[in-house]
Amino acid sequence: MATGKPVVMIVMAGRPLTIGRQVDQAAAVLYAFHGGTMAGPALCNILTGKVVPSGKTPITFPKMVGQIPLYYNRHNTGRPSYDPPMLIDSIPIGCPQFSIGQSSYWLETPTEPLFPFGFGLSYTTFEYGSTRIDTLPFREGQGVGYSLSCTITNTGSYDAYETPQLYVRQLSGDLVRPLCELKGFQKIFIPAGETREVIFTITDDDLGYWHESHDGLSSRVWFATDDVDFRFAILPYSQSL
């Protein structure tokens, strides 16, 4: 690296590692996990450009060990975060404490991971359109259904696969719900310069969760969907909605 020649770092591991310092020094990172007996030819095809990479991270990569446990579908703390952190030397002398941004983290570490869940780069680029939602006819035993769609354009120079992901956030409810939840994904092939439409279908059951109550002597468990507002988005990787 001291010579200035670009270096591609290949990581073979079965779990996310804290590799922030190495990522800063490498020109690119290829996380191979445990690729099996054909890992060598597969990596060679990616590095030489025979194959355009299309993998997505199935886990969240932390910036540091202190962030663990770290997961995309965490609960909301109800407190705002401030990213990047406010440096103490940049705070004016004598200012009231509330002027520094009311910063608070859900963990006492940076708020963002090194690589979020569902993230992955390609040799090409993709542009996502707005998510559209349509209500489907009521079906006995399934309740109301919803069709969610968006267009994805390959704006780069290479034919490639992309994996759009459907995320849902429940804005209120009987219990605190995650900031976002993965409800579906698809892998689609999009030639360079072309546009494809991706469609997801979900029902009321896909938006429900398990409830539990106790009265001191017994407990009751049931599955239900809250009659509240939801937010939907088709995204290239997990983001807070």
Regions found by a protein language model. Give the residues of each.
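A short helix->loop->beta-strand "cap" motif at the edges of active sites that frequently abuts
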Residues: A2-V7, A26
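Short leucine-rich amphipathic alpha-helical surface patches
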Residues: D204-D206, F232, P236
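Intrinsically disordered, low-complexity Pro/Gly/Ser/Thr-rich segments with frequent PxxP/GP/PP motifs
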Residues: D174-L217
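Short beta-strand elements
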Residues: S238-L241
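Terminal accessory/anchoring regions of large secretory-pathway or extracellular enzymes
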Residues: T155-K187, R196, R231
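Secreted, periplasmic, or luminal enzymes acting at the cell surface/secretory milieu
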Residues: M12, P16-Y161, Y167-R169, E212, ...
